[in-house]
A protein has these predicted regions:
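Terminal alpha-helical segments
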Residues: 1-130, 134
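Positively charged, low-complexity/disordered segments
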Residues: 135-138, 142
Length: 142
C-alpha cells in the first residue's frame, strides 16, 4: 500500500506534480524562444529536464537537494544501466552547461538555433520520462 504524506499526497501525486512542472517549464521556454529571450528559454528548458529527472527519482522514492546530485544519481541509476538511452546523459550535461552559461556568464550569447535544440531535447526527455513512468514493468530501484 502506498504511503500518504499530508503535505504532498502520494508518491504518484508527487511524480505527477513534477511532470506537470516540467511541462510548464517547457511551455515557458517556448514562449521565451518566440520572444527572442534565448538565455531565459535555455534556463526553462534545463529546468524542464531537471523537474522530469526529479519525477523519475520520486517514482522510486528518492530525492536530492542539489542539482549535481540529482543528475549524477540519474546518470548512475538510469543511464549507465541503460534504462534510459546513454545519449541522454550527454544531453543532460550539455543542457546544464548551457543553462549555467546563460544564467552566469555575462559574455555568453545564446543563439536561436542552440536554444531550439535545447527545447527539443527537453521535450524529448519529458516524453522519455513519461514512457518510463507509465511502464507497468519498468525496472525498480527500491
Amino acid at each position: 500500500m502506498e504511503q500518504y504524506n499530508e503535505k504532498i499526497g502520494t508518491r504518484k501525486d508527487l511524480v505527477s506534480y513534477r511532470i506537470e512542472t516540467a511541462k510548464s517549464d517547457l511551455k515557458s521556454a517556448k514562449i521565451l524562444l518566440n520572444a527572442g529571450e534565448y538565455k531565459g528559454a535555455n534556463n526553462r528548458a534545463y529546468y524542464a529536464i531537471f523537474h522530469a529527472i526529479n519525477a523519475v527519482h520520486a517514482l522510486d522514492g528518492r530525492a536530492f537537494k542539489r542539482h549535481k546530485d540529482a543528475i549524477a544519481n540519474f546518470n548512475k541509476d538510469y543511464v549507465k544501466t541503460e534504462i534510459f538511452p546513454r545519449e541522454v546523459g550527454r544531453k543532460i550535461g550539455e543542457a546544464e552547461e548551457i543553462r549555467h552559461a546563460s544564467d552566469y556568464d555575462d559574455f555568453y550569447i545564446a543563439s536561436k538555433e542552440e536554444t531550439e535544440r535545447q527545447i527539443a531535447v527537453a521535450g524529448e526527455f519529458i516524453e522519455l520520462s513519461l514512457i518510463h513512468i507509465s511502464e507497468p514493468t519498468r525496472p525498480r530501484l527500491i
